[in-house]
Amino acid sequence: MAKLTKRMRVIREKVDATKQYDINEAVALLQELATAKFVESVDVAVNLGIDARKSDQNVRGATVLPHGTGRTVRVAVFTQGPNAEAAKAAGADLVGMEDLADQIKKGEMNFDVVIASPDAMRVVGQLGQILGPRGLMPNPKVGTVTPNVAEAVKNAKAGQVRYRNDKNGIIHSTIGKASFSAEQLKENLEALMVALKKAKPATAKGVYIKKVCLSTTMGAGVTIDQATLSAVAN
């Protein structure tokens, strides 16, 4: 059996895997254990009571976190005409049509989010095999195919997170950095929970939010007592 590192021993001693933690206690514990030489992200895994095999029960969407994610997001926009100027004014890092598509085909992908106006999808459609596997393909369900590209750029820059369940019905997302205050992380988590509840499929039966677990990049998972989140998130 592999020998536990000192860090992992400390985590095992401090984290009770059988306990549901108060949100404030959980955040304080994660911050105490976030001792990596870089600022760790705080991630969340939400187990949903859905049947991920059924397309009408899949959950996907996007929401802007009130305190952002702590990441600098580079945004590429496929559009033209007045929309191109609006996208640049909103802070887009790359704006174009065929010229931008050519860059991507050459492997130049210095961006984190791709947004497109509907008229640009004829160009973006050629990039499905490149953007799709990377989770970058624009989609109207998450607001990245839209006539209002300027608003989409502002949302992306402000800390919008996109989410979709995996094959096990689990949503994985980030809610900030370990350097955030406990209140900022709590409010970001609550904003995500509100969005997930609004996205509940009509055909989902039984308990919808089964489990909420927080972790840092290099740390262990901590299960959250949902009753300690604000009423609007419950």
UniProtKB/Swiss-Prot annotation:
A cellular component annotation (GO) from this entry: cytosolic large ribosomal subunit
Keywords: Repressor, Ribonucleoprotein, Ribosomal protein, RNA-binding, rRNA-binding, Translation regulation, tRNA-binding
Domain of life according to the entry: Bacteria
Gene Ontology biological process terms in this record: regulation of translation; translation
Coiled-coil annotated spans: none
Signal peptide (from-to): none
Function: Binds directly to 23S rRNA. The L1 stalk is quite mobile in the ribosome, and is involved in E site tRNA release.
Family from the record: Belongs to the universal ribosomal protein uL1 family.
Protein name in the entry: Large ribosomal subunit protein uL1
Species in which this protein is naturally found: Edwardsiella ictaluri (strain 93-146)
